[in-house]
């Protein structure tokens, strides 16, 4: 389960940004997950809650967005998009000669903070 490592690194980045803006608490985080990143959203959500315990991000709302992967089909010479790594065939010609062109992995898109004291 590499999701725990991804969440630990994401939390480091979130805490750095929150600290830079004087946050007392992180209230929400938006993360985009690439279709071919091999990340299970349920595992990521569970691990994120786990690593945030005892930090300024504890209890924050996690928003996950799945991103399509852009692929090039060698057979029909077209760009196609796929939403899951489980499908490796071109939706146009059903060939399996796809080359991944763009899949942004895992990105922290937005962090919502609270700057006030409780």
From Swiss-Prot:
Disulfide bonds: none annotated. Ni(2+) binds at residue 2. Keywords: Metal-binding, Nickel, Zinc. Zn(2+) binds at residues 73, 76, 90, 93. Pfam families: HypA. The keyword Zinc applies. One of its GO terms (biological process) is protein maturation. One of its GO terms (molecular function) is nickel cation binding. The keyword Zinc applies. Belongs to the HypA/HybF family. Involved in the maturation of [NiFe] hydrogenases. Required for nickel insertion into the metal center of the hydrogenase. This is Hydrogenase maturation factor HypA. It comes from Salmonella typhimurium (strain LT2 / SGSC1412 / ATCC 700720). The gene is hypA.
């Amino acid at each position: 389960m590499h999701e725990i490592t991804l969440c630990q690194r994401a939390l480091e980045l979130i805490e750095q940004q929150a600290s830079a803006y004087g946050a007392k608490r992180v209230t929400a985080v938006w993360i985009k997950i690439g279709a071919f990143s091999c990340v299970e959203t349920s595992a990521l959500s569970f691990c994120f809650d786990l690593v945030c315990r005892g930090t300024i991000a504890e209890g924050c709302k996690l928003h996950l967005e799945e991103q399509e992967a852009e692929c090039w089909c060698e057979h029909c010479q077209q760009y196609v998009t796929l939403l899951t790594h489980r499908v490796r065939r071109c939706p146009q010609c059903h060939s399996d000669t796809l080359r991944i062109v763009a899949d942004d992995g895992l990105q922290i898109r937005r962090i919502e903070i609270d700057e006030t004291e409780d």
